[in-house]
Amino acid sequence: MSTETPTIPEGTEPKTAEGDEVIEPRTEVELGYAGASQVVADGGAATVALFGNVHRSEVRGGGKIKDPLRFREALSALHDVVQSDFRYVPKDRTAYLAYTRLKKASAGLDLWEAQRAYVDWLQRNDPLAFALLDPIVSVHPDEIFFEVFSKDEGSYAKLGVDLSALEPDANPIFGTTNIDFSDELFGGIQRLRSYRETRLAVASHAVALTTTGVPEVLEKKVRVPDAWLRGFLQVQSAGTLPRTVFRLAPIDLYNVLRHLRLNADVPTTSAAPGKAKPKRGGRGMRIELVPGEAPRLVLEPWEVVIPTTAGVFTGTKPEVVRIWGRRRLLLLRRLLPFADSIDVHLLGSGLPSFYVLRAGAFTFTLGLSGFTSANWAQAVSFDLLLPRKADSAATERVAAHLAKSWSGSAQAIAKATGLSPAETLEALQVGCQQGKLMFDVARDIYRYRPLTGAPLDSSRFEFRNVRERRAHDLCAQKGVVRIVSENRIHGVGLELTGKIIVAADKREYRPELLIDDEGRVKKAECTCAFFRKHQLKEGPCEHLIALRLFEAREEVKRREQRGKTRGTITMETRTYARRHARGEDVYQLALDQKRLKIRWGLRGQDARVQSLFFNSADDARVAYFERVDDLEKRGFLDASAS
């Protein structure tokens, strides 16, 4: 039985000052290894010896690797994801000034006390240096797979090694554990060669190595921020949502990566005389999907169109999906030459996307969140897609079934547990969010994979902080949150002004948000005391979060009603695009009560604008939908969310 007990260490539990400031809680996880994972050379053979966590249940598996080169490059890509951090790091001297104060304060201490003070300072000021949970490895009846999550909460990766890639050892022990993926192990992996016999060995104690001068068990504790664990669970759980799938050839992705490597994210046009300097160009990638045609990849801001060669899109609905995090695709560069095909799974514009590389018996899944931990506005809207609560009995029943069968499709699990398909799906999604289960995007099945040895307290991962919890409470109360004005400014973004009446405070708050086309907050203001004191330095206040939540929910309702109840719509904006030899025509239709504004022109050029005013909202609505129907008949794609 596992002795691992995730707890909140003393001094790291949530605290409030004046009822508003929150210190980020962390989960302490105890790890112990019977030896350091390494590559052991023995004559003409090499063994990738991975020691599991002794504080978790015994796990054992492995065998002779049939294709060492693909195995080497797949593990190297996994290591690149572990080390990746795409967050912006500004120049500041905070760490240096803190270090000088520490040095002065510890001048009179002996060596041991000084080292302890330095480690304590690192844990307080650089928590990510200690925060990474070691990679997870699971031995299942059909494959051995590894899972990792990046520092910036933006990239998730899973490497699946099918049993056909091995000459498997006898008597495996199925289960999940952690492994220590150190730089020394990575260096040893780089020395694997195709002409040298290579073996994989995963075990807690049974990896036979000769060690001298090291303790019997290597113990370490990591203090993982709950936000990081929450991001891991949510991005992995996103695979359970409805997805649009299409296929790429490896050369298609290579063309994307080549262009990104040769071009920086800078504006492509200079300012005209007498005009202001243009803003930085977009950093997204648009994917144009038309049934019966090959998908097209469009790189912003250069508007470079990369046609794909793996076949036509087999979906039934034409659409344009805009995704972010495209430079994270460079994490696949080492495995790309060995890939046979690439399946792309899209959830929608600005939402997580998954890239499944199939390289023989190896399958590498890269999940991109579409945002980093700093982009709270996009993260909050993503939270609405996953269920908040579910029947705990159904979740336990599903988890108990998978603990025996190890994996299964949603249909097979529903049949085995006697639950309805809807109940099964919700229970599986909640199980993934709680860290008990995981969804294998590559195989479209669910697996039993406890993230930690001891169950995680799911209530601590439901919200990022107390302000987000309060924001959800505000939105749950009818009539408390209202949108006073909603203005979509062409080329700028969405401008929101809200009105929030809090009876407990006997006050009315007026939050304002400007969200650009990439989902980032460009401007935020609120009349509350928390915002006046901290601005956005301590994160958004509960009223800004509530406004963003309310707008996202209203947008979901509008999209669900699109094409069903046109007679009730009084405010809506749609964008349509159609590509031709000269470029791409873009139309934007904005209905606002009695007013209809139309913008059209070639993408990247100044648009023509026409404003129409009507005697009634009904007349404006009729004119709006007449133009919508006309554009769709002419073959324009709905790019409203892109």
Name the predicted role of every residue range:
Residues 2-642:
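Long, low-complexity, compositionally biased intrinsically disordered regions
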